[in-house]
């Protein structure tokens, strides 16, 4: 206690002391205590928060510039220690909060060869990956279980059960010779039956899988940085890899699929599907039709988070007019699934479905015509508004979808059946009264809608 009090009094009497040193690598074990303290204070002053890559990482901004070539070579080396170091480093460098104060000197995706090196790690795993239903479980080694000496710890039990020669009655030399030759033949076949005895296929496979997942996580982090979006959206190998992972979502690792899906969602607003038929070098056989089918396939999956991401992805892809010809053939299938998502009692699924439908009907007339004829489409959109959805923007988009549907003359006869529901919402929901006023005007005030109104009212 006396020493502690003396230390406190000595620190207070010395006036204003420097900030405490950050934890990290020691500055030198051979230097004196005073020199170490001075070095720690100097390092703490030099490392201001604006110069750090993260709130608690002692990594300077210049680290990327000085080590970018080393990181790429480490990824390409294939050595476990080097690849692990590079992936861990990139994970730290690529993790960036929205309000982070740091500014990378160079966008990570623009480092020469870095994106290709990461994609190569994923391709190496996919080359040896087995479908989940074909993956072998833990196998019990049965090498030489019927032999007297096996090398697996059963020697004493086996030797104790051996009968001495001549104990059998009526045994002949020919039978003994036959048994001896049979034993030799069986022992020579042990090594052929025990595949993978002297290599570590399963362990190596799991290491490759972990590296591929880590690489996909780094690429996902890259896609969140605006400086990297253009480079990645125009990188054919990157798009082919992530779309192929999405296409194989039934058999591929779930985390790898999730990272690929989030990556492609972040890049979708800049993506042109015609890149798959361009003259750029191709690494995976995938075209525009297969890419859209992969997204629709994951939209129909049983994982709700994947459904939401796929819906958002389709809504962003359709904004580009060049992508419409590849999405239009699958519009009926997409509509049906999005309407199913509206019926799920989950606010995120409903929001994703409404957002995708809003973009589809905004840019494509064929979408407006087909959506109005879909069963339960209007009912579930009205339910989102009546409930209401906790996010007002979702309710507003649902009302805008109905307004877009009624703008097509072919849809007015179908929508007249909901005239009473529209009138109720006109007086109940003040926020969306303008939209429903325009909807009722389109249904009843147009000169060509008199016959349609009679059909809606009298059921003609």
UniProtKB/Swiss-Prot annotation:
Source organism of this protein record: Arabidopsis thaliana
Gene of this entry: LFR
Record's protein name: Armadillo repeat-containing protein LFR
Keywords: Developmental protein, Growth regulation, Nucleus, Repeat
Lineage: Eukaryota, Viridiplantae, Streptophyta, Embryophyta, Tracheophyta
UniProt keyword Kinase, yes or no: no
Subunit structure: Interacts with AS2.
Location of this chain's protein in the cell: Nucleus
Extent of the ARM repeats: 227-269, 323-362, 366-407
Entry keyword Repeat: yes
